[in-house]
């Protein structure tokens, strides 16, 4: 208990690993489970039911695991599930799920959630994503892995962003974004393959070239969806990355 500041408030039903550090004026509500090696700076609020994995860091004035303001929510028991080694910077907000959909909000591992980011009810985030300052995810949004949201990106309900996709500053996402692609501008439009991001993630030149070919077939040749996917299957090397690209479109 020596790692809990005397001004912090921890509900008696919360389960806190002995290695967790809880800073001044933080509040941990009922049915919150926090695993080892987490750190809460000052004025952090975590409500439950919430399960927080190992090695997460919460900076000042985060509000995590709170009831959603969605009007469908009628006080039913829902949860927040957080994986390991995520960073939640100042003033970000994460709401639990609703009974009308998943019943939970889920965040994977190694995500960087920057100041002012809003993650609404029933969202699902994969791993290694970067959500830049003041991005907003409406309810039911899904992100794959290694997604980067530019600052002030707004994502409409039920949209899906595939792995390794990238959004420009102030993008307004109202449709799904396929894996490996970039969107930018206002109104927001496709802006090409996320080539620089793929290079930084150590994709080979051959993989990137193959994805560019698939991208051009789908977005530049004016084909119907099924025809474009058929042409990608017949003319592009069917490696893992192309399969992910195809699946992100088929699951849209």
Label each residue range with its predicted role.
Residues 1-7, 12-13, 18-19, 55, ...:
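Terminal amphipathic alpha-helical/low-complexity segments used for targeting or macromolecular assembly
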Residues 3-189:
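Structural signal for interior beta-strand "rungs" in well-ordered beta-sheet cores
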